[in-house]
Amino acid sequence: MGPLSRDAWAQRLGAFRASPSAFMAGPEGEDLGRDLLSDLRSEKLSEQTKVSLLALSMEYPAQLWPDASAAEVAATSLLDTLVLLPPRPSALRRPLLLAATTALAAGGALGPTSGASCRLLPLLLGLAAGSDLGRGFVPASEQRPLQATACECLRELESCKPGLLGGSLGLLRGLLGQEGPVQPLSLLLALALRNTLVLQSRVGAGLGGLLTDKVSPTGGGPWDWTLVEEGDGRLQPQAPSWPAAEEGEGERSLTAREHSPEEARELRAAVIQLLDTSYLLTPVAQAQLLWLLGWALRGLQGQPPALFKPQLVRLLGTAQLTLLHAMLALKAAFGEALFTAQDEALLLRRLTLAAQHPALPPPTHLFYLHCVLSFPENWPLGPEGEEAAPLLLGPQLCRGLLPSLLHDPMALLARLHLLCLLCAEEEEEEKGQLPSPRHYLEELLAGLRQRAALDGGPRALATLCFQASYLVACCLAGQPTVLTPLIHGLAQLYQARPMLAPHFVDLLDQVDSELREPLKVVLRQVVVSRPGRDEALCWHLQMLAKVADGDAQSATLNFLQAAAAHCTNWDLQQGLLRVCRALLRAGVRGGLVDLLQVLARQLEDPDGRDHARLYYILLAHLAAPKLGVALGPSLAAPALASSLVAENQGFVAALMVQEAPALVRLSLGSHRVKGPLPVLKLQPEALEPIYSLELRFRVEGQLYAPLEAVHVPCLCPGRPARPLLLPLQPRCPAPARLDVHALYTTSTGLTCHAHLPPLFVNFADLFLPFPQPPEGAGLGFFEELWDSCLPEGAESRVWCPLGPQGLEGLVSRHLEPFVVVAQPPTSYCVAIHLPPDSKLLLRLEAALADGVPVALRTDDWAVLPLAGDYLRGLAAAV
Amino acid sequence: MFSAGAESLLHQAREIQDEELKKFCSRICKLLQAEDLGPDTLDSLQRLFLIISATKYSRRLEKTCVDLLQATLGLPACPEQLQVLCAAILREMSPSDSLSLAWDHTQNSRQLSLVASVLLAQGDRNEEVRAVGQGVLRALESRQPEGPSLRHLLPVMAKVVVLSPGTLQEDQATLLSKRLVDWLRYASLQQGLPHSGGFFSTPRARQPGPVTEVDGAVATDFFTVLSSGHRFTDDQWLNVQAFSMLRAWLLHSGPEGPGTLDTDDRSEQEGSTLSVISATSSAGRLLPPRERLREVAFEYCQRLIEQSNRRALRKGDSDLQKACLVEAVLVLDVLCRQDPSFLYRSLSCLKALHGRVRGDPASVRVLLPLAHFFLSHGEAAAVDSEAVYQHLFTRIPVEQFHSPMLAFEFIQFCRDNLHLFSGHLSTLRLSFPNLFKFLAWNSPPLTSEFVALLPALVDAGTALEMLHALLDLPCLTAVLDLQLRSAPAASERPLWDTSLRAPSCLEAFRDPQFQGLFQYLLRPKASGATERLAPLHQLLQPMAGCARVAQCAQAVPTLLQAFFSAVTQVADGSLINQLALLLLGRSDSLYPAPGYAAGVHSVLSSQFLALCTLKPSLVVELARDLLEFLGSVNGLCSRASLVTSVVWAIGEYLSVTYDRRCTVEQINKFFEALEALLFEVTQCRPSAALPRCPPQVVTVLMTTLTKLASRSQDLIPRASLLLSKMRTLAHSPATSSTHSEEGAEAIRTRATELLTLLKMPSVAQFVLTPSTEVCSPRYHRDANTALPLALRTVSRLVEREAGLMPG
């Protein structure tokens, strides 16, 4: 494919810039790099186009040449293009140099094995030195710009591979003295010096003659890569910042070796040389230089920081932010060695006053506040990393820096941070005449919350409030006097505006447990205390899913129960189930099972119902550890419980039937006289919920046929149970005692066995009536029975004392069902059937004042004394 | 119904704030306190009445105001108009605790009747009804010289009788009956005198002539409601009022009322000779008062029927004729019920009446009481009244569906007489398409009536057709509208939405190509066949904005609920299958009225589940159709609720526990179909044109797939893969545009849970196919049945650290 036209390239570059990765993934992507390189040599394209092509290659080297080999090829090609340029002024030389450098650096191809590197480095060094490379390579007019560019390129390469220029230090130092671009050279030298110092001291070597050796390394054959290999590329801070990361290691290694006086003198001379010319540099470059030198010299023995003193005089009055920052960096590095207390006070005053300047743009304002907040002190107190306000920053100074609701959010937060630091210090200070910072802080937070609670207020206000709360929680985590009102204030905020729930959830996720746990409790109370239909139900549920745990179960469950009725759509139902899930994971059982069952039956949406049922079944059937596994992978898998084999007291207990105190009471109900057999009516009553109750009865003395056991599925205290009917099959008509045993399961799953107090079957309990004779035939029927008794039976007369109720009352009370013939109030004929096949006939006649004579007959002798006792006892019986 | 002006007045009245009303009341109070009974007061009271009656029950007046109103009502000097207003306001405010109207102090009977009306509106809390009744009776008994008093009191009496039937004692009732006889039968036949106009009235006032019939002829027989004249005397007024209360009184003093003794007496007198001859000849004899009243009432009704034959000169009179006919037939019905001897005397005349009326569309409302008469007495009279019903059910709805009054009466007639229809229920059932016309046109007032009527109409034979008809009800409304619009101008145009013009629809209505479909929709009787009306839905789309159609569409979900609760009582297995199929099939062919589809879908989905609960094997039997339904993915998102239900039912009931015929192949087939559906649902890019797929469809699909996998374990790896894909998908930002954050989280949670469950296949199988008793309330409580308790005990045994239960 021939070279593309200018327009074609413009189109292509436009497409590329719109979405580089998409373009590279597309069909044209492969050829782009190749075409670009080849077209750089094309005659048809103007220089302008070529410059734009080169700009592209500088901006997107990683996309164009993704691996080292491609980068190598590209750099070689670029260098060839450079060499082939005709010896006349051209705008392409500098871009070409830069592009080649970029390709090598970004592609990771820089190294001793790379041909391109070995060509580029000497070329750059030569150009930087301003020496003529022959063949009219550089037109005179381009000499200086190229020199500067070469320096930039070298600096780039040096910062990629620290130590690369270690051998050229002398040469560079020499150049600085001569005519030439000061700024690039100064920066390059400072960087190389810094890197060399650090690397040399790490390996324990001195500078040697590096600073004085003015011979170009290119002259003596291949490039010297030894320092680079030692450095191993680990020394790569890219931006001027507090050199905290490297500090520990750097300091140790820097002090490891002392320089010889010779070396020290040379070094000092070099540094002074650099500093002396530094005023010529732009402020940013100056800051960079100071930072590099500061780091290079920090902790280096024999190199007093007093070297910087002359510069400080200039710097203390600077209005340039970068220079101010550089100075603070020097202060952080050298502390009291360089700065007196007066300096420090002056700096602080400058900072605080500058931070209050009304006309400052917000970023500058924030910068000053940041400087105040992390002010490097001469004598840092307290452990590393602990935040504290600067010591010399008195309350007087701070007064102007207190936050107010009118500040813009970032400034407010920064000032709030300072305020928090002041509050943290406040404890040891006595109460001043000024309102205490803590009080101020509380008012401010309350104001923020008030603004956040405004209905329909912008979200930014709420966000600010939560940011401030978070900040306070972080800074003052250990202070309950601050946290308690904060928590309550937040709870009120939630109450006022539940739609902030997502913010709360976020805050809970972020803060430490010192705030989180109490805040959770309070929020849960707020949510749970307002059950029922609410616009904010979805927020409440979202909140509850976050804060619900094992505590205050019943209130939470009640809330959910009330909410369930209003969860009509799927989203709300899912919210509800999310809360249930949180409870499940917190290990709540009890009422939750009931709730889930209700949900599984009542929710409207089939999916919600199904999901509730799934939770219900899981909760009902799985033991806690397994439930944890089933609900989510985050809980650790339980260790397999292998105690089946272990001897275990409880294990035995659970499998055995245990003797227990009786939890059931039985009472005899009223007598029942229907049916062919006498039936006892028993009224059971439980003291605790019991299940599968089996009552076994044993008759003493074989008087009755063996009795069936009675089963009751479930008995609960306070719930009336149905009476139990126990039919008796007497073998002879006699009272008896029944032994009662109960066997049941408790609600905890144990099987128990208990002796109940014995039951007494009375003589009267066995009475059964004869079938009712037809109307009017009663007397004849009775006479027939009366007569049938005698030959083998017995007859007797008994005096039955009458109580206050008289004969009528007595009969109606005790003998009513058995009366065959009645002539009230004087005469009654009573016929009683006694199972299995005996009868007892009574004639009560002519009652006197205190008793009635009873004539009785029976066909069973044995009954006679029982009947006598019965009759005599009637009056006493109520 | 109201003119725009009246409408705006009502609006104003309703929007008056309490503050304003309070001020207004205090002004009225001032006026009343000053006993200013001039036009100002009149105007203010009129306004107050408007406000009070326009905002029913929500306004309360202050006690002082109420007291003043009462006082004004009691003022002897108060003009009548003010009194009427005061009474009306007090009636509107009832029941009121602070009422202290004294019944005894009022002298004027006019005033008495007003006070009585207020008292009777109180709801008989302090036995007011009885007191008022006795008071009126005293007035009646006192035989005051002449009637203005009675004229006002008789309506009060009528009301008392209805409100509290036991008020009157025997002799009082007899007295009233006697007087009713007098009033009914012996009103004068001369017109009343005009009011004497005072001093300046001309003495040359025309001599009052005799009363006339409606056609202008001089009255030949006794005076009735239908006699006309310029001015009525008081006894004529009483005649009219007596007729008004006649039916209520007859019912009150009927054989089952306090008058039982009388009938017994009479039957003893006449023995069992209930022959036609004896019945006709009994008129002249002296009868007990109640008997006499019946006799007179019968004569009165017959005279009315005869009078209604005459051609009325004025339109008002002709309306009156019809109304009186209705009442007369009803009275006759009551008479015949109380005393069968009237039956034979009235039959011939009623038959003639029916013959006369059936051809006259104007007097169609008379047909209903007539039909009721024949329905209740047809058997006794051995008359074949089939023709009456045929005419009633086939012709009337077709022609008169747009008359709101008739529609309401017609449906109430059906509802009230369901118990009488026993033999003719099939006629009623088969004519449901006709009844639905009433419903379609007048859906708001008739919905509740139909909910009560549907259980009787639903029948296994016509259930499917009826379901179709219910779903097409809004369409039917639209077609009825078209029918009316295209009909030649009727004398009285029914109300329709004049703002809506749909010429294309009208053309389509006349297009012979669609005649068949329109005829089908307008069929008078159930035809047994069903036709796809989808073309009509498209055609009639412009009518969907019509207010009537929208109202009808709102009523349909309620009716569907009622229909299903009725049909599930009679449905057998195959009908359930057919119903389920119909549900699925019709879900995407509904009339496009706004909001209609959503409402219907929610009912259909819950009913589909109800059908599945009734017959779980439905899922296996209809497997092919269900698969087909799930395959047609277009429009799935709009039917989300139905899809959710169907998918859930598949997961729940496609299992061997419910149907032994369920095979692994079937499960696999469903799994594949649902898997494809899930992919289709989640992979489609969000676009403005397509509705978003709700997250519950995704979650229910995932759950169902997991359930199926737990039953056919070969599918577990596939299901796991699918679930983990869904989980990552829910994390990706692409989904967040499709689902809300909560939705995405729900999907994620569900996928995670199901994934972990599938890792424990034994648990999954148990948990995802629970036995039916799981949902019984005692499941986890009862130690006898509770698997949970047993499991918990075992797990406690197995865990050492759980510290076993206390010994």
Swiss-Prot record, chain A:
One of its GO terms (cellular component) is lysosomal membrane. Signal peptide: none annotated. Coiled coil: none annotated. Keywords: Protein transport, Transport. One of its GO terms (biological process) is protein transport. The keyword Transport applies. The keyword Cytoplasm does not apply. Residues 250-260 have a biased composition (Basic and acidic residues). Residues 234-260 are annotated as: Disordered. As part of AP-5, a probable fifth adaptor protein complex it may be involved in endosomal transport. PANTHER family: AP-5 COMPLEX SUBUNIT BETA-1. Probably part of the adaptor protein complex 5 (AP-5), a tetramer composed of AP5B1, AP5M1, AP5S1 and AP5Z1. Interacts with ZFYVE26 and SPG11. This is AP-5 complex subunit beta-1. It comes from Homo sapiens (Human).
From Swiss-Prot, chain B:
Its main location: cytoplasm. Probably part of the adaptor protein complex 5 (AP-5) a tetramer composed of AP5B1, AP5M1, AP5S1 and AP5Z1. Interacts with ZFYVE26 and SPG11. As part of AP-5, a probable fifth adaptor protein complex it may be involved in endosomal transport. According to PubMed:20613862 it is a putative helicase required for efficient homologous recombination DNA double-strand break repair. It comes from Homo sapiens. InterPro entries: AP5Z1, AP5Z1_ARM, ARM-like, TPR_AP5Z1_C, TPR_AP5Z1_N. This is AP-5 complex subunit zeta-1. One of its GO terms (biological process) is axon development. Pfam families: SPG48, TPR_AP5Z1, TPR_AP5Z1_C. It is linked to Spastic paraplegia 48, autosomal recessive: A form of spastic paraplegia, a neurodegenerative disorder characterized by a slow, gradual, progressive weakness and spasticity of the lower limbs. Rate of progression and the severity of symptoms are quite variable. Initial symptoms may include difficulty with balance, weakness and stiffness in the legs, muscle spasms, and dragging the toes when walking. In some forms of the disorder, bladder symptoms (such as incontinence) may appear, or the weakness and stiffness may spread to other parts of the body. Disulfide bonds: none annotated. It comes from the Eukaryota.
